[in-house]
């Protein structure tokens, strides 16, 4: 098949959505498909909203470089014109409606007033656009079982076109993560626990929950420290200056993929505090590197728990931190979570949806 895979951010492995789209495309090419990846970034200036100009750029690219048997795109770009240019697959990289509801509910809760109410009402056309994109899709691939269950409950009339896909590290990164796991000490190396939190500093990532936890934890355990990585420049505004000055908290606003193994190796336990999450590739990365992870029940957590029954733990951590069992993950993990299997599953679901026209 000739498949166009679309991602909105710039095509770089440093960003989550392009990273997993590039990996999926590479795995599909290994299966013999012609699978280019394209991004409209940077979106051209012009008239109309940013989203409309973004979608128009994708429509132009598909028209000028087609025909395509399948067009795999985020739901916000699933337009009528794109649906006419190929078998339209909407592949989720984040739970769009829950994100939208969570963000505006948070604004109304924490900053009530006319401005927050106005923005909540103004988001209704965005929600309508998401519904329209799902309606046009021939196949909706939900990211993880949590999102699939959510979509089935709210949109039972689309059950026939709901599918599932997952994510995992690239093969070359997996080898590095395995090496980190095998070199881990069997006891904590210092008097305190070195926690690691990875993600954008955004409310849906559970930053308020994280800060509340840190106030309690750092007061009760003076030797504990935490690194907050990939957070951008804004995290410092929400954290006490004393914590930063005394290095109880270390901020790493950004890091390259090559720096990830050393970052993981230098910590004892991971934290995952999301309130709404798509998948959370950092979960795979922390667990595969041998870190026990204290996590909220979001993103990939229920999908990964069968393979990490003791390493994947409920947030917040208790007073004692036990290291990860060397028996985890079991052999079934890499059979389920590898890009060859993910691409094969994508292929089967797309072929079935094409036959059901």
Regions of interest found by a model, annotated:
Residues 112-140, 149-153:
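Membrane-proximal helix-turn-helix segments that form the acceptor-binding/catalytic region
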Residues 19, 23, 193, 200-216:
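A conserved mid-protein helix/loop that constitutes part of the nucleotide-sugar donor-binding site
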Residues 275:
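Aromatic "clamp/platform" in nucleotide-sugar-dependent glycosyltransferases that forms part
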Residues 90-125:
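Acceptor-binding helix/loop patch of EC 2.4 sugar-transfer enzymes
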Residues 237-255:
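Nucleotide-activated donor-binding/catalytic signature segment of Leloir-type glycosyltransferases, i.e.
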Residues 49-53, 179-181, 315-357:
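A charged, aromatic-enriched C-terminal amphipathic alpha-helix characteristic of glycosyltransferases
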Residues 198, 225-238, 253:
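Glycosyltransferase donor-sugar binding loop
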Residues 292-295:
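Short hydrophobic beta-strand element within catalytic cores of glycosyltransferases
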């Amino acid at each position: 098949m000739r498949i166009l895979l679309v991602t909105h951010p710039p095509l770089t492995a440093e960003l989550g959505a392009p990273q997993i789209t590039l990996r999926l495309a590479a795995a599909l090419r290994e299966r013999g498909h012609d699978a280019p990846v394209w991004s409209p970034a940077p979106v051209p200036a012009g008239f109309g909203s940013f989203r409309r100009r973004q979608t128009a750029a994708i429509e132009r690219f598909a028209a000028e470089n087609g025909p395509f048997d399948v067009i795999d795109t985020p739901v916000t770009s699933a337009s009528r014109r794109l649906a006419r240019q190929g078998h339209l697959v909407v592949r989720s990289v984040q739970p769009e409606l829950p994100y939208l509801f969570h963000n505006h509910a948070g604004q109304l809760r924490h900053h009530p007033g006319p401005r927050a109410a106005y923005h909540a009402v103004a988001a209704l056309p965005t929600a309508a656009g998401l519904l329209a994109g799902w309606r046009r899709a021939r196949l909706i691939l939900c990211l993880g079982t949590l999102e699939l269950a959510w979509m089935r409950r709210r949109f039972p009339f689309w059950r026939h076109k709901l599918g599932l896909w997952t994510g995992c590290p690239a093969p070359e990164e997996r080898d590095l993560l395995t090496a980190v796991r095998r070199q881990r000490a069997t006891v904590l190396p210092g008097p305190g626990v070195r926690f690691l939190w990875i993600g954008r500093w955004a409310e849906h990532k559970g930053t308020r929950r994280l800060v509340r936890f840190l106030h309690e934890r750092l007061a009760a355990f003076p030797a504990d420290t935490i690194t907050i990585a990939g957070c951008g420049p804004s995290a410092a505004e929400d954290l006490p200056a004393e914590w930063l000055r005394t290095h109880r908290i270390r901020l790493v606003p950004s890091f390259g993929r090559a720096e990830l193994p050393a970052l993981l190796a230098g910590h004892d336990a991971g934290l995952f505090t999301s309130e709404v999450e798509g998948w959370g590739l950092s979960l795979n990365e922390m667990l595969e590197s041998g870190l026990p992870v204290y996590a909220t029940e979001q993103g990939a957590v229920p999908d990964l728990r069968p393979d990490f029954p003791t390493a994947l733990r409920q947030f917040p951590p208790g007073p004692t931190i036990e290291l990860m069992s060397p028996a985890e993950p079991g052999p079934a993990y890499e059979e389920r979570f590898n890009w060859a299997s993910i691409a094969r599953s994508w292929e089967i679901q797309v072929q079935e949806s094409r036959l059901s026209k």
